[in-house]
């Protein structure tokens, strides 16, 4: 816009006023009248600066007057200029109604000056001036205010021109506010400013042409006198141009999507950050609420804490008391165990010594009997009184056992198969008396102790209550690993009168402590959520720590492998004990020690107790001879040990049993005795008894065509016996030999023997031949 700056106008105004005052006084005189009129108008609006306002009005009037214009035309131009500036100022800071009210008065005053050249104009009253001034101040105060009334707004160029043409609208010097920093702009102002700058840059040439045309029109309006009608049209055209320019300045440019997208993204980021902060605050508040509720519950359950404390304190006191009690009683328990063990050991040693002495005495007697030169003249032997007494006792006990078998109906029993473990009445009385005294002392151990501290079931109930009420602390205390050691003294007391070598002894699974521990474990298995496996191992641990060591002591010093009753009872109790280790992957040292003791004891029995003498054929004539009877008793005694060894099938490894039973006993003693005997039905019967003792599990494999290596000597003896027996007299015995071969899986030998000797069809057992 080609408008001249305000300072340039002022400078030219001052110069023109000075030149006019020096050169032409008449022109100044004619110009002062309209100027004074304009000055009075401004003076009414601003009473405190009336004189300066009138001076400025004269300067404006003189500077805009054309030199060649007539006085009347100059006056009209000056009036229109003053009125135009007044209209622009009022249009910017006042309402439309005020401007409409003042415009007719201004037009009428101007027309009167043109027609009558009268200096009289309408002066607004003080209230109107004060209200207009107040509105201007309020309009200037909010920097981001944009009026929505287009009639009251103006374009940027019009506002600038209004300010340039009407410097009197500026506040006085003492009312001006000095700005040291740029006034902050609002977002709408910045957008409008950027929009106007881009529009000015894009249409710079057209804007300059338009501004030039406007400036020329203004200059022509100043220089040429325009009639009233034309002035009105010009005023309307100026207003329409102003409105048009206003519309152009406030209209928004085409939308830039990148800027909008960026602003939306920024706004979205701010909202998301705000949402996250609110979410964090919300979570914090929720956590505070939870902690508050927990605190409330803790405070409300303060009584439960008191009860828990009393329970733990009572449990601690209970455990301390039971430990003190057991520490005090363990000395008496050990003494009683030692007394009972000593009593049983003395009895076992006495029986073993008696058997060995009787064996030596009888063997010596038979040796003397075989020597003809040692006999006396009347044919009797010179026997020591002691040996004679031993022989009489041996024969008396045999008579008693024979009578007992006849009463029981066991007529097929062989001499030597029974256990010679009978005691004399005096010895039995003394033994039972000592055993009763020990058991009586055992009852007095916990006589002064409450059942809650000496009864296994009551103790486990206490710990079961702990496990049910506070399982976490129960399992954290590893109670399941401590209970076996805690219960061990009490179980040892119950095992004090338990003899695993007696058939009538109570089984382990029938004992009260066994039942109580089993129930405790079953209740633990019901609590699946908290079960850690320690309670399931309590019974196995108790047996491993308490029962197995006691079994080991019995095996090492008291057990007699030649006793079938003791061996059967011992194997039954060992199977019950070993069943508890079936699910355990770890190897128990106590169990291995027990198995080693069993093997060692059987080896010792084979070496010390087995003796089968070989007499000359002449000494064995007749089955009723002393030599023949003694040899038969010793053979059947060895066969009984062979059978007792094989009773450990399933408890001891197969290779160990085969080495003991077959290698050390069958091949070394039994086969030699059979080879020295005369072939016949008795030999076949003994072979059948040997085959009956062999475990069937060793021959379950249907693909086997040959027997186990340790039975090779036995199979050869069977074939030799079958060859010596004639088919006509011993047909049944040969068939029995074939059945024995089939049982021990010597199928090839059985088939060859059957082909050599055509016999009757074999029973169902030999269908595999």
Swiss-Prot record:
Entry coiled-coil feature ranges: 256-308
GO cellular component assignments: cytosol; nucleolus; nucleoplasm; nucleus; U2-type post-mRNA release spliceosomal complex
Residues bearing the modification Phosphothreonine: 86
Cell compartment(s), UniProt: Nucleus, Nucleoplasm; Nucleus, Nucleolus
Region described as Disordered: 1-122, 134-212
MF (Gene Ontology): DNA binding
Residue numbers of Phosphoserine PTMs: 16-17, 19, 85, 118, 169, 203, 206
The protein, known as: Intron Large complex component GCFC2
Subunit structure: Found in the Intron Large (IL) complex, a post-mRNA release spliceosomal complex containing the excised intron, U2, U5 and U6 snRNPs, and splicing factors. Interacts with TFIP11 and DHX15.
Organism the protein comes from: Mus musculus (Mouse)
Disulfide bonds: none
Regions of compositional bias (Acidic residues) in chain numbering: 202-212
PANTHER family to which the protein is assigned, alphabetical: GC-RICH SEQUENCE DNA-BINDING FACTOR, INTRON LARGE COMPLEX COMPONENT GCFC2
Family the entry assigns: Belongs to the GCF family.
Origin superkingdom: Eukaryota
GO BP annotations listed: spliceosomal complex assembly
Function: Involved in pre-mRNA splicing through regulating spliceosome C complex formation. May play a role during late-stage splicing events and turnover of excised introns.
Keywords, in A-Z order: Coiled coil, mRNA processing, mRNA splicing, Nucleus, Phosphoprotein
Basic and acidic residues: compositionally biased ranges: 190-201
């Amino acid at each position: 816009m080609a408008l001249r700056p305000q300072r340039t106008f002022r400078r030219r105004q001052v110069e023109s006023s000075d030149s006019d005052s020096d050169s032409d006084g008449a022109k100044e005189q004619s110009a002062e009248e309209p100027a004074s009129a304009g000055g009075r108008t401004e003076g009414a609006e601003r009473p405190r600066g009336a004189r300066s306002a009138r001076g400025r009005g004269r300067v404006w009037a003189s500077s805009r007057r054309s030199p060649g214009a007539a006085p009347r035309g100059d006056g009209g131009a000056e009036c229109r200029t003053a009125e135009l500036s007044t209209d622009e100022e009022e249009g910017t800071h006042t309402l439309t109604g005020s401007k409409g009210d003042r415009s007719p008065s201004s037009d009428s005053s101007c027309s009167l000056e043109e027609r009558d050249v009268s200096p009289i104009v309408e002066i607004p009253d003080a209230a109107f001036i004060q209200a207009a001034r107040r509105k201007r101040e309020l309009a200037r105060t909010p920097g981001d205010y944009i009026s929505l009334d287009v009639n009251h707004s103006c374009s940027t160029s019009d506002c600038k021109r209004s300010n340039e043409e009407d410097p009197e609208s500026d506040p006085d010097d003492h009312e001006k506010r000095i700005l040291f920093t740029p006034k902050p702009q609002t977002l709408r102002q910045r957008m409008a400013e950027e929009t106007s700058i881009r529009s000015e840059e894009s249409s710079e040439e057209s804007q300059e042409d338009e501004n030039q045309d406007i400036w020329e029109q203004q200059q022509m309006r100043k220089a040429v006198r325009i009639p009233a009608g034309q002035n009105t049209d010009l005023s309307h055209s100026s207003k329409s141009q102003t409105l048009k320019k206003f519309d152009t300045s406030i209209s928004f440019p085409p939308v830039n999507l990148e800027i909008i997208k960026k602003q939306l993204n920024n706004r979205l980021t701010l909202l998301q950050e705000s949402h996250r902060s609110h979410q964090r605050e919300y979570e914090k508040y929720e956590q505070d609420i939870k902690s508050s509720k927990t605190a409330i519950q803790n405070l409300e359950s303060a009584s439960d804490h008191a009860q828990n404390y009393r329970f733990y304190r009572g449990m601690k006191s209970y455990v301390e008391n039971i430990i003190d009690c057991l520490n005090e009683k363990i000395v008496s328990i050990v003494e009683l165990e030692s007394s009972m063990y000593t009593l049983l050991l003395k009895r076992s040693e006495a029986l073993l010594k008696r058997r060995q002495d009787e064996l030596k005495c009888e063997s010596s007697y038979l040796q003397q009997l075989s020597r003809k030169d040692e006999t006396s003249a009347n044919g009797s032997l010179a026997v020591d009184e002691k040996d004679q007494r031993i022989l009489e006792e041996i024969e008396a006990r045999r008579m008693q056992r024979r009578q007992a078998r006849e009463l029981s109906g066991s007529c097929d029993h062989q001499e030597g198969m029974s256990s010679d473990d009978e005691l004399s009445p005096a010895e039995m009385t003394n033994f039972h008396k000592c055993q009763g005294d020990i058991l009586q002392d055992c009852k007095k151990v916990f006589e002064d102790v409450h059942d809650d501290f000496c009864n296994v079931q009551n103790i486990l109930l206490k710990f079961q209550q702990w496990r049910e009420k506070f399982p976490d602390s129960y399992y954290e205390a590893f109670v399941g690993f401590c209970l076996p050691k805690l219960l061990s003294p009490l179980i040892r007391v119950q095992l004090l009168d338990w003899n695993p070598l007696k058939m009538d002894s109570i089984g382990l699974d029938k004992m009260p402590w066994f039942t109580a521990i089993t129930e405790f474990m079953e209740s633990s298995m019901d609590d699946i959520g908290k079960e850690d496996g320690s309670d399931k191992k309590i019974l196995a641990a108790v047996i491993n720590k308490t029962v197995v060591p006691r079994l080991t002591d019995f095996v090492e010093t008291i057990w007699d492998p030649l006793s079938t009753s003791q061996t059967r009872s011992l194997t039954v109790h060992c199977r019950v004990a070993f069943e508890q280790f079936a699910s355990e992957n770890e190897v128990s040292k106590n169990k291995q020690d027990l198995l080693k003791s069993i093997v060692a004891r059987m080896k010792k029995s084979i070496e010390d107790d087995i003796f089968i003498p070989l007499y000359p054929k002449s000494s064995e004539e007749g089955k009723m001879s002393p030599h023949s009877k003694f040899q038969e008793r010793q053979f059947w005694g060895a066969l009984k040990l062979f059978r007792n060894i094989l009773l450990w099938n399933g408890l001891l490894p197969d290779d160990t049993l085969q080495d003991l039973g077959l290698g050390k006993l069958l091949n070394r003693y039994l086969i030699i005795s059979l080879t020295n005997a005369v072939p016949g039905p008795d030999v076949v019967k003994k072979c059948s008894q040997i085959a009956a003792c062999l475990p069937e599990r060793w021959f379950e494999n249907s693909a086997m065509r040959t027997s186990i290596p340790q039975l090779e000597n036995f199979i050869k003896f069977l074939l030799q016996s079958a060859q010596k027996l004639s088919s006509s007299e011993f047909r049944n015995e040969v068939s029995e030999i074939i059945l024995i071969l089939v049982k021990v899986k010597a199928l090839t030998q059985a088939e060859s023997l059957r082909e050599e000797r055509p016999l009757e069809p074999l029973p169902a057992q030999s269908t595999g031949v």
